[in-house]
UniProtKB/Swiss-Prot annotation:
<dbReference type="InterPro" id="IPR033709">
    <property type="entry name" value="Anticodon_Ile_ABEc"/>
</dbReference>
<dbReference type="GO" id="GO:0005737">
    <property type="term" value="C:cytoplasm"/>
</dbReference>
<dbReference type="InterPro" id="IPR002300">
    <property type="entry name" value="aa-tRNA-synth_Ia"/>
</dbReference>
<comment type="function">
    <text>Catalyzes the attachment of isoleucine to tRNA(Ile). As IleRS can inadvertently accommodate and process structurally similar amino acids such as valine, to avoid such errors it has two additional distinct tRNA(Ile)-dependent editing activities. One activity is designated as 'pretransfer' editing and involves the hydrolysis of activated Val-AMP. The other activity is designated 'posttransfer' editing and involves deacylation of mischarged Val-tRNA(Ile).</text>
</comment>
<keyword id="KW-0479">Metal-binding</keyword>
<comment type="subunit">
    <text>Monomer.</text>
</comment>
<feature type="short sequence motif" description="'HIGH' region">
    <location>
        <begin position="84"/>
        <end position="94"/>
    </location>
</feature>
<dbReference type="Pfam" id="PF19302">
    <property type="entry name" value="DUF5915"/>
</dbReference>
<dbReference type="InterPro" id="IPR013155">
    <property type="entry name" value="M/V/L/I-tRNA-synth_anticd-bd"/>
</dbReference>
<feature type="binding site">
    <location>
        <position position="679"/>
    </location>
    <ligand>
        <name>ATP</name>
    </ligand>
</feature>
<comment type="similarity">
    <text>Belongs to the class-I aminoacyl-tRNA synthetase family. IleS type 2 subfamily.</text>
</comment>
<feature type="region of interest" description="Disordered">
    <location>
        <begin position="1"/>
        <end position="43"/>
    </location>
</feature>
<keyword id="KW-0436">Ligase</keyword>
<dbReference type="InterPro" id="IPR023586">
    <property type="entry name" value="Ile-tRNA-ligase_type2"/>
</dbReference>
<keyword id="KW-0030">Aminoacyl-tRNA synthetase</keyword>
<dbReference type="GO" id="GO:0000049">
    <property type="term" value="F:tRNA binding"/>
</dbReference>
<dbReference type="GO" id="GO:0005524">
    <property type="term" value="F:ATP binding"/>
</dbReference>
Length: 1119
C-alpha cells in the first residue's frame, strides 16, 4: 500500500517517482485523512454530485483561505469586486460577471500572486427605497415624511439585505471564492465617512458646486438623475408614442412691423405639449432661411371653422426647407404648390428680437414672474431643419438648451409643476394634472383658440427611469454637481493607461463618453443614502456654508456625533439632519446652520469603493496607496457609463490616477428569445435547475468560452450549457477514467516523466507544452474565450487521437521489469498538467481529478505549470498535426462514400510538398484509416491535374489584344509552371492575373491546404472479409461490456451464424486475430452457447444474416 501523504507536505509539490505497486492505486488517498472512494473511478460521472462533494471539502478544508495565506509575502494582484444589490436574486448577468471575477483571480493565484477577494454590498439609493415602498404600501413621497425617516430608512436597510444568504449560496455554488466574512457595505458608517471625505475634497478643490440645471427627472421617485444613468442600458430608452403639435405664434411689435412681418404666424413644433404653458421664447437658426407662405386655396388648418377673411388670409413663417412638409396643413394640394407660393425669405439672424403674441397669460405679470424679456425670437446655432419647422419653442425650465439660451437673454426659469410633475395652480386650465395627463386638454385649448395648425402621433425613443421604469421628464432643479468638465481632458489622458477588453471600448464607448462628459449631478431628493455633508444658514441675510469630511469634524462643531437609536454613530438621515448649531456669522444669534436635505447619488457611493471599503484616509492609508489602482475589474458593457466611469472620474479628481489598469467590459446575457434576461418573461433556464442537472463547471464553461467576454452578446440556452459537458468535461473525465482503469488493471502508480521516446508520447508532451504557453498568454490577456478554445482543441486531441491510438499500449500494461510504464507516466504527466491549466475554468471537476490522481490537497494550491519543464518538438508537432489533418480529410471521404472505418481499403495517396517527412507516420495513417498501403508523393502538384483560368479583366490592360491568345492557350493546356512562374501562350502571368485549381476527377479525392488526398475504394473479397471480422470484434466487445466484464477478463467465445455465407466470408479474414483482440482463450463457430449471449440482427454490421455472440468468463483457476 502506498503510504499516505503528510498534511504538512507543500501543496505545490509534485509526487516523485515510485516503484511501489498496489492492487488498485487510483484514486490515490488524500492528505486530509479521508479514505478515497472504495469503488474505482466511475465511467458515468454525475458532475453536480462531484461538485457538491468538492464544495464540502473546500468548506471543511479552508482551501480558499489557504490559497491566500500560502501567498503571504508574494506580489499582490489587486482585484476590485463591484458590489451588487442584495434586494433581489442573482440572474445570469450576475453569474456571468461572477464567473469572470473568479477565473482570473484563481489563475493569478496559481501564477504566484496574492489575490484578496473582498465581497461588498451596494445598499443605498432608489433600489432599496423602492423595495421598501413596495413592502410598506407607499405610493407617494409624502407618506414617507409622515411615517418618519428613521422607520422608512430602517425598512430600506432591511430590504436591501434581504437576500444576502441566498446570494452567498449562489456565489458558493458557482465555486466562486470570495471573502464574505470581511465584506463591506456601503451603509456602514466607516464607508460613509470616507464618502463624505471625498465630497469635501472635491469641494475644497473647487470641483463640487451647487447649481440650477435642467436634468433628467423622475416624477415617480421625485428626484433628478445623472446623464450617465440614461446611457447605461439600452432599455432605458424605449419606444413611446406621444402627441406632437405645431402651434402658431403671430408676430407683433415694432421690429415685426419694420420687417413687414406683423401678424405673420410663426410655426413651432414640439413633442411635449405640456411644456407650452411655460413657452417664453422661440429660437431660430442664424443661417437658416425662413419663408413667408400665405394660406393656400384650401385654407390653413388653424383657420378651419373660423371663416373671417383675416384668418383665412393669414401668412405663416417656417424654414424654407420644410415648407413642403406642411403643404397640406397650409392649404395646398402638393409640396410643390406650397413651395411655389413662398412670397419672401429672411435669414434667421434678422429675426432676433421680434416679439410675438403669447399663448396664455399664466405668467404675463412681469412684476411677479420677471417675464419682461419674454415672448421674443432668439437666435442660436443648435436649431436644425432635420424635423419640425426649423423654429423651436422654448420652455427654459424643461430643456437644457432652452435654459441656456433663455438665461442669456434675461428670461427667467419658471417651474410650472410640483415634484410629482403635477401642474401648479398658476396654470389654471390644467392645475393638478400630471404632465402626461395634461396633453389632451392643452391641445383642446389650442384648437379652440385657433393656435393649432397640426396634431400628430409621434413614435420616438424616450428615456425612462432605470429603476421604476416610468417615463422621465427634463426639469430644472437645484442640485450639487461635480465639475467634471474641469478635469475631463485629464480623464481622457489617464484612460490611455488602462488596458480594455475588448480593446475598442477604450477609445470607443468609454473614450467617447469621456470626451463628451458633462458635469455630474450628485444630489438626490431622497432619504436612504450617504448625506451631502453641507450645512447652510437658514437666514439668507446671514449666509454661510459649511462642508464636513469626517465624524471628528462634526463632533468638533456640533458637540456631538449623529447617533441612531442604538447609540451608534450613524450618518444616515434623520440622525445626521438632527445636527444643528447657531450660525457663527449671525451676530443676532437667531439663524441656525442646518444640513441640506439631499443625499448623494448612489453612484457616488459605488465610485468611492476603492478607498471607502477600507475607511481611507482614516485607516489603512498605506494599504490603499499600495493597492490603487486595481490590477483588474470586470462588469458588463453598460458600466462603461456607470461604475467604470465614476470610478475613473473620482480617482482622477481625488488622486490624479486611474482607479484600475485592466478591465473586462463584457457583453450582455440574453434570454432564449433574444431579449435581456427577465424574471417576468422567464426567458432563461432556471439557474438552480442547471446547477442540479449539468453543474456549475458546465455553466462556467459555457459563459467563459463564449464571445460575451469580448463584448458580444450571448443567448443562454440549456443546450449551450450541455455542450460544455460534451466538449470538455466528459473528454477530460473519460481520459481520467481510462487512465485509472488501466493503471488499476496493471497495478501501476504512475510518476511524472517526460522521458518517453514513443512518438505519440513525445507528440502529446510537446502539444501539452504548447497548450501551457498558449493558455498562459490568453489568460494573461484576460481572454478566457481563446483559452477555452485551446483547451477544447486539446481535449479533442487527447481523447480522439492520443488515447484512441494508444489503447493497445495501455491494454498491455506494465510488466514486472517496468516495461510499458512510459505510456502511463506520459498520460499521468499530461493529466496532472492539464488539470492545473484547466483549473480556473473548471475548478470543481479538475479538483476531484487532480486530488484523486496525485493525492495532493488541492489543485488550486499548486503553482501554474511551467512550459519549460515539458519538451518542445516543433518538427514532430508540425508533422503529426499534418497527419491528423490528412486523417480527418480521408475519414470524411470515407463517410462521403458510405464506407465504414472497419472496412479496410487498398490504399491512400497523399501528394504534397514535404511528403517525405510523413514517411515515419505511414503506419499510423494505415492503422488510423484502415488502409493496406500509403503512397506518399513528393511535390505539391506532382501527378495531380490542374486547370489554369486567366482573369481577362486583370490581364487585358497589360497585354491588350493578346489576352485572347493567352486564354485559348490556358484552355488547351499550352501552359507551364516553373519556380512559381506561370506562362501561357508565351506570356508570363503575374499574381492576380490567373487562378490555378486542382482538378478533382476521383469521387474519393480532395485537395485541401496544398495537399491532394485520394482513397482507393475498390473492394476485394479479402477486404470485405476483414471488414466483417472487425465488425465481429466490435460485436464481441459490445457483448463483453453488456456482460460487465473487466478489461482484462479472459473469455471463451462462441460465434453462431444464421447465414452460412457470413461464416465462409469470415474464414477469408486471415489477417485478423479475433482471439487476441477480444481476450478469447478459445474461439468456436458453433451453435449459440455461453454464460452471456447477445444476438445481432442482419445488416447491423456487414452481416447478411443474424449472428449470436456467446461468452463465458474464464476464471483464473480454470486456466
Amino acid at each position: 500500500m502506498v503510504p499516505r501523504r503528510s498534511r504538512q507536505r507543500p501543496a505545490s509539490s509534485c509526487r516523485t517517482a515510485k516503484t511501489a505497486r498496489r492492487e488498485m492505486p487510483y484514486p490515490l488517498p488524500a492528505p486530509d485523512g479521508q479514505e478515497p472512494e472504495a469503488q474505482p473511478v466511475t465511467p458515468s460521472p454525475v458532475f453536480p454530485e462531484i461538485e457538491e462533494d468538492v464544495l464540502a471539502f473546500w468548506d471543511r478544508d479552508g482551501t480558499f483561505h489557504a490559497s491566500i495565506d500560502n501567498r503571504d509575502g508574494a506580489p499582490e494582484w489587486v482585484f476590485y469586486d463591484g458590489p451588487p444589490f442584495a434586494n433581489g436574486l442573482p440572474h445570469y448577468g450576475h453569474l456571468m460577471t461572477g464567473y469572470a471575477k473568479d477565473v482570473f483571480p484563481r489563475y493569478q493565484t496559481m501564477r504566484g500572486k496574492k489575490v484578496e477577494r473582498r465581497f461588498g454590498w451596494d445598499t443605498h439609493g432608489l433600489p432599496a427605497e423602492l423595495e421598501a415602498e413596495r413592502q410598506l404600501g407607499i405610493t407617494d413621497k409624502s407618506q414617507i415624511e409622515e411615517m418618519g425617516l428613521a422607520a422608512f430608512n430602517q425598512a430600506a436597510k432591511d430590504s436591501v439585505l434581504k437576500y444576502t444568504r441566498e446570494w452567498q449560496q449562489y456565489v458558493t455554488r458557482q465555486a466562486r471564492w470570495v471573502d464574505f466574512d470581511n465584506g463591506y457595505k456601503t451603509l456602514d458608517t466607516t464607508y460613509m465617512e470616507s464618502v463624505i471625505w471625498a465630497f469635501k475634497q472635491l469641494h475644497e478643490k473647487g470641483l463640487a458646486y451647487e447649481g440650477y440645471r435642467v436634468l433628467p427627472y423622475c416624477w415617480r421617485d421625485q428626484t433628478p438623475l445623472s446623464n450617465h444613468e440614461l446611457r447605461m442600458d439600452d432599455d432605458v430608452y424605449k419606444m413611446r408614442q406621444d402627441q406632437t403639435v405645431t402651434v402658431t405664434f403671430p408676430l407683433t411689435g415694432a421690429k415685426a412691423e419694420s420687417l413687414g412681418l406683423t401678424g405673420v404666424r410663426v410655426l413651432a413644433w414640439t413633442t411635449t405639449p405640456w411644456t407650452l404653458p411655460t413657452n417664453l421664447a422661440l429660437v431660430v437658426g442664424p443661417d437658416i432661411q425662413y419663408a413667408v407662405v400665405p394660406a393656400g386655396p384650401n385654407g390653413a388648418a388653424d383657420a378651419h371653422g373660423r371663416p373671417d377673411d383675416e384668418v383665412l388670409s393669414g401668412e405663416y413663417l417656417l424654414a424654407i426647407d420644410l415648407v413642403g412638409n406642411y403643404a397640406k396643413d397650409l392649404g395646398y394640394g402638393s409640396p410643390e404648390a406650397a413651395r411655389a407660393a413662398v412670397t419672401r425669405t429672411i435669414p434667421g439672424r434678422e429675426l432676433e428680437g421680434v416679439t410675438y403674441d403669447r399663448l396664455w397669460d399664466y405668467y404675463a405679470d412681469a412684476a411677479t414672474w420677471g417675464t419682461q424679456n419674454a415672448w421674443q425670437i432668439l437666435v442660436d446655432g443648435y436649431v436644425t431643419t432635420e424635423d419640425g419647422t426649423g423654429i423651436v419653442h422654448q420652455a427654459p425650465a424643461y430643456g437644457e438648451d432652452d435654459q441656456r439660451v433663455c438665461e442669456a437673454a434675461g428670461i427667467p426659469v419658471i417651474i410650472s409643476v410640483d415634484d410629482g410633475a403635477r401642474f401648479l395652480p398658476a396654470v389654471q386650465d390644467v392645475a393638478g394634472l400630471q404632465v402626461f395627463e395634461a396633453g389632451k386638454p392643452l391641445i383642446k385649448l389650442l384648437r379652440e383658440e385657433g393656435r393649432l395648425l397640426r396634431q400628430a402621433s409621434y413614435e420616438h425613443s424616450y428615456p425612462h427611469c432605470w429603476r421604476c421604469r416610468n417615463p422621465l421628464i427634463y426639469k430644472a432643479v437645484s442640485s450639487w454637481f461635480v465639475r467634471v468638465t474641469d478635469f475631463r481632458d485629464r480623464m481622457v489622458a489617464l484612460n490611455q493607461e488602462i488596458t480594455w477588453v475588448p480593446e475598442n471600448v477604450k477609445d470607443g464607448q468609454f473614450g467617447k463618453w469621456l470626451a463628451g462628459a458633462r458635469d455630474w449631478s450628485i444630489s438626490r431628493n431622497r432619504y436612504f443614502g450617504s448625506p451631502i455633508p453641507v450645512w447652510k444658514s437658514d437666514d439668507p441675510d446671514y449666509p454661510r456654508v459649511d462642508v464636513y469630511g469626517s465624524l471628528a469634524e462634526l463632533e468638533r462643531d456640533f458637540g456631538r456625533l449623529p447617533l441612531n437609536a442604538a447609540g451608534e454613530p450613524d450618518l444616515h438621515r434623520p440622525f445626521v439632519d438632527d445636527l444643528t448649531r447657531p450660525n457663527p456669522d449671525d451676530p443676532t444669534g437667531r439663524s441656525t446652520m442646518r444640513r441640506i436635505p439631499d443625499v448623494l447619488d448612489v453612484w457616488f457611493d459605488s465610485g468611492s469603493m476603492p478607498f471607502a471599503q477600507v475607511h481611507y484616509p482614516f485607516e489603512n492609508s498605506d494599504w490603499f496607496d499600495s493597492h490603487n489602482p486595481a490590477d483588474f475589474i470586470v462588469e458588463y458593457i453598460g458600466q462603461a457609463r456607470g461604475w467604470f466611469y465614476l470610478l475613473h472620474a473620482l480617482s482622477t479628481a481625488l488622486f490624479d490616477r486611474p482607479a484600475f489598469t485592466n478591465v473586462i467590459s463584457h457583453g450582455i446575457v440574453l434570454g432564449n428569445d433574444g431579449q435581456k434576461v427577465s424574471k417576468s418573461l422567464r426567458n432563461y433556464p432556471d439557474v438552480n435547475d442547471v446547477f442540479d442537472r449539468d453543474g456549475s463547471d458546465a455553466m462556467r464553461w459555457f459563459l467563459m468560452s463564449s464571445p460575451v467576454l469580448r463584448g458580444g452578446n450571448l443567448v443562454v440556452t440549456e443546450e449551450g450549457v450541455r455542450e460544455g459537458v460534451r466538449q470538455v468535461l466528459l473528454p477530460l473525465w473519460n481520459t481520467w477514467y481510462f487512465f485509472s482503469l488501466y493503471a488499476n488493471a496493471t497495478g501501476y502508480e504512475a510518476k511524472r516523466s517526460t522521458a518517453s521516446a514513443a512518438v505519440l508520447d513525445r507528440y502529446l508532451l510537446a502539444k501539452t507544452r504548447d497548450l501551457v504557453e498558449a493558455v498562459t498568454a490568453d489568460l494573461d490577456a484576460l481572454d478566457s474565450t481563446l483559452a477555452s478554445a485551446k483547451l477544447r482543441d486539446f481535449a479533442d486531441l487527447l481523447t480522439n487521437w492520443y488515447v484512441r491510438r494508444s489503447r493497445d499500449r495501455f491494454w498491455a500494461g506494465v510488466d514486472g521489469e517496468g516495461a510499458g510504464a512510459e505510456a502511463f507516466d506520459t498520460l499521468y504527466t499530461v493529466l496532472e498538467t492539464l488539470t492545473r491549466v484547466a483549473a480556473p475554468l473548471l475548478p470543481l471537476v479538475t479538483e476531484r481529478i487532480w486530488k484523486d490522481l496525485t493525492g495532493g490537497r488541492s489543485v488550486h494550491l499548486t503553482d501554474w505549470p511551467d512550459a519549460a519543464e515539458l519538451p518542445a518538438d516543433d518538427a514532430l508537432v508540425a508533422a503529426m498535426d499534418r497527419v491528423r489533418a490528412i486523417s480527418s480529410t480521408a475519414l470524411s471521404l470515407r463517410k462521403q462514400a458510405g464506407l465504414r472505418v472497419r472496412l479496410p481499403l487498398a490504399s491512400l495517396t497523399v501528394v504534397a510538398e514535404g511528403a517525405a517527412a510523413l514517411a515515419p507516420f505511414e503506419a499510423i495513417l494505415r492503422d488510423e484509416l484502415n488502409v493496406k498501403a500509403v503512397c506518399l508523393v513528393e511535390g505539391e502538384h506532382s501527378g495531380v491535374d490542374r486547370a489554369l483560368t486567366v482573369k481577362a479583366r486583370q490581364l487585358g490592360p497589360r497585354i491588350g489584344k493578346r489576352v485572347q491568345e493567352v486564354i485559348r492557350a490556358a484552355k488547351s493546356g499550352d501552359w507551364s509552371e516553373a519556380d512559381g512562374v506561370v506562362t501561357a501562350g508565351g506570356v508570363e502571368l503575374e499574381p492576380g492575373e490567373y487562378e490555378l485549381a486542382v482538378v478533382i476527377s476521383a469521387p474519393t479525392a480532395r485537395f485541401e491546404n496544398g495537399v491532394y488526398i485520394e482513397l482507393d475504394t475498390a473492394l476485394t473479397p479479402e477486404l470485405e472479409a476483414e471488414g466483417l471480422a472487425r465488425d465481429i470484434i466490435r460485436a464481441v466487445q459490445d457483448t463483453r461490456k453488456a456482460a460487465g466484464l473487466g478489461v482484462s477478463d479472459r473469455i471463451a467465445l462462441t460465434l453462431a451464424f444464421e447465414n452460412g455465407g457470413d461464416a465462409r466470408v469470415l474464414g477469408l479474414a486471415t489477417e485478423v486475430d479475433i482471439a487476441s483482440e477480444t481476450l478469447a482463450r478459445t474461439v468456436q463457430v458453433a451453435a449459440a452457447a455461453g454464460a452471456f449471449v447477445k444476438t445481432f440482427g442482419a445488416g447491423q454490421f456487414a452481416n447478411v444474416g443474424d449472428f449470436t455472440v456467446g461468452i463465458t468468463k474464464i476464471e483464473e483457476a480454470d486456466e
